[in-house]
Curated annotation (Swiss-Prot):
Belongs to the UPF0303 family. SUPFAM superfamilies: GlcG-like. This is UPF0303 protein ACP_1015. Pfam families: HbpS-like. InterPro entries: PduO/GlcC-like, PduO/GlcC-like_sf, YBR137W-like. Coiled coil: none annotated.
Length: 165
């Protein structure tokens, strides 16, 4: 799978994974779904669901370390700024052999273009927040979020799943 193909597939995920509505209860369902998936699979994750400016769900699972919360913050900053998944931004920069620091002057201490943060898009409202996980390799972080959003929105994950790298 080429970078260009991955970029196109992630863009397809971003445009298709849309919630009809999103409130505190939806955030709880999404965060709880991610937590359940992580527990069942033995993943040591930090999970964060937020509207921009307001945390709605957060959890740290056994084996997670404090640095993962810092990764959540840095990935969230990317999605809040660009309204794209952190993985999409990272893939596009990799294709151009560049970085956010080089292209935008954004410091890596505050911005991480690694997979795992995905915009929360609501029909008729646009992007209102993001969901982030940290603790797995970046592609796996990204895919776990996509799988959970598919489950909540009734979409078939197999249709949107990225192929194994």
């Amino acid at each position: 799978m080429s970078l260009a193909e991955d970029i196109a597939l992630v863009a397809r995920q971003e445009s298709a994974l849309v919630f009809e509505h999103f409130d505190e209860n939806t955030a709880w369902q999404l965060g709880s779904r991610l937590r359940q998936m992580a527990v069942e699979r033995g993943y040591p994750l930090v999970i964060d669901v937020r509207r921009f400016g307001q945390v709605l769900f957060t959890a740290a699972l056994p084996g997670a370390v404090p640095d993962q919360a810092e990764w959540v913050r840095r990935k969230t900053n990317v999605v809040a700024r660009f309204h794209r998944s952190s993985y999409a931004i990272g893939l596009e920069l990799a294709e151009k052999q560049s970085s956010l620091e080089e292209k935008q002057g954004l410091p890596t201490v505050d911005f991480a273009t690694h997979g795992g943060c995905f915009p929360i898009r609501v029909k008729s409202a646009g992007i209102i927040g993001c969901v982030t996980v940290s603790g797995l390799p970046q592609r796996a972080d990204h895919e776990l979020v996509v799988e959970a959003i598919c489950a909540l929105t009734g979409l078939d994950y197999a249709t949107y799943k990225l192929p194994q790298a």
